[in-house]
Amino acid sequence: MGRSLKKGPFVADHLLRKIEALNERNAKEVIKTWSRASTIVPEMIGHTIAVHNGKQHVPVYITEQMVGHKLGEFAPTRNFRSHVKGDKKARH
């Protein structure tokens, strides 16, 4: 179930303030955030936001196609390191 339209998308206040400040002075800086639940809004297009994945900040360049998605979708938290090819121990 989606969020009510009358409420609007969730964006962390501190993140939105930083984006608006950068847009006012036409600056391009990397913004660090832990707010993976924030929705990407059109004001963020063209900015690079470093989203925390639990270990480090992953830089995410915001494009037009990302609007409406959450920041956390673009910073994977799990790293799959493929199965060992010649592992004979697993099979008996």
UniProtKB/Swiss-Prot annotation:
Domain of life of the native organism: Bacteria
Keyword Cytoplasm carried by entry: no
Entry keyword RNA-binding: yes
GO MF entries: rRNA binding; structural constituent of ribosome
Listed GO biological process terms: ribosomal small subunit assembly; translation
Keywords: Ribonucleoprotein, Ribosomal protein, RNA-binding, rRNA-binding
Pfam families recorded: Ribosomal_S19
GO cellular component: cytoplasm; small ribosomal subunit
Function: Protein S19 forms a complex with S13 that binds strongly to the 16S ribosomal RNA.
NCBIfam families noted in UniProt: rpsS_bact
Cross-referenced PANTHER family: RIBOSOMAL PROTEIN S19P FAMILY MEMBER, SMALL RIBOSOMAL SUBUNIT PROTEIN US19M
Family according to the record: Belongs to the universal ribosomal protein uS19 family.
Name of the molecule in the record: Small ribosomal subunit protein uS19
Organism of provenance: Thermosynechococcus vestitus (strain NIES-2133 / IAM M-273 / BP-1)
Underlying gene: rpsS
